[in-house]
Regions:
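Noncatalytic regulatory segments and standalone regulatory/sensor domains
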Residues: 101-114, 123-174
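Short coil-to-beta transition motif at edge beta-strands of beta-rich domains
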Residues: 81, 85-87, 92-93, 103
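Structural recognition of the beta-strand scaffold that forms the well-ordered cores
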Residues: 67-68, 86-91, 121, 132-135, ...
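Histidine-centered active-site/metal-ligand motif
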Residues: 118
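Cysteine-nucleophile protease catalytic domains, especially the papain-like/related folds used
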Residues: 1-77, 82-83, 167-172
Length: 174
């Protein structure tokens, strides 16, 4: 978001993301489609992550020009990056498909989740080298990852992607 002229910190976003319990009293788990599951910081309790819907909703609190690409093929995501728009995506910590999914009962029904869920911002790519560059919240800027593996993980994780275009002259946020 900072890239697009939106003055907001990661901490502020973390404080404002919708959250749901990791586990309810009845044994059901939170649904990442409804909010960040558990503790965002991980300091007070377990946390899993969040899917595109709550991220889109959060971004709309700060900018008018937010777009949800969820369901789009990976080429569409790459095209947006080529147009100059970094794209937030859901992937895995391996940046490749994983096999450690488990089924959770949630208030909305059963969903399959993985503790390998991860999100990054795609910042660039090199078609000749077949690599994608991502800003990884684990401390890596423009981290190089394999294109085909990343595209397969993107598909496995539900083709979830959100991007923001240059900030309009919006004067109030949140």
């Amino acid at each position: 978001m900072n890239y697009n002229g939106i003055d907001v910190t990661k901490s502020e976003l973390a404080d404002n993301i919708e959250t749901v319990p990791f586990q309810y009293d009845n044994g059901e788990h939170g649904n990442p489609n409804d909010g960040f599951v558990g503790s965002v910081s991980g300091s007070t309790s377990a946390g899993l992550g969040v899917y595109h819907g709550p991220i889109y909703k959060l971004a709309k609190q700060y900018a008018d020009n937010v777009y949800d690409l969820t369901g789009s093929n990976f080429d569409t995501v790459v095209n947006k990056v080529e147009e100059g728009h970094p794209v937030w995506t859901i992937t895995t910590t391996a940046f490749a498909p994983v096999s450690d999914f488990e089924s959770w009962d949630t208030p909305d029904g059963k969903i399959d989740v993985t503790y390998s869920e991860h999100s990054v911002c795609i910042t660039g790519f090199d078609r000749d080298k077949r690599v994608i560059y991502v800003n990884d919240p684990y401390g890596y800027k423009n981290r190089e990852v394999d294109w085909n593996d990343f595209a397969a993980a993107y598909k496995q994780m539900g083709k979830q992607a959100v991007y923001v275009t240059k900030c309009s002259n919006r004067t109030s946020y949140a």
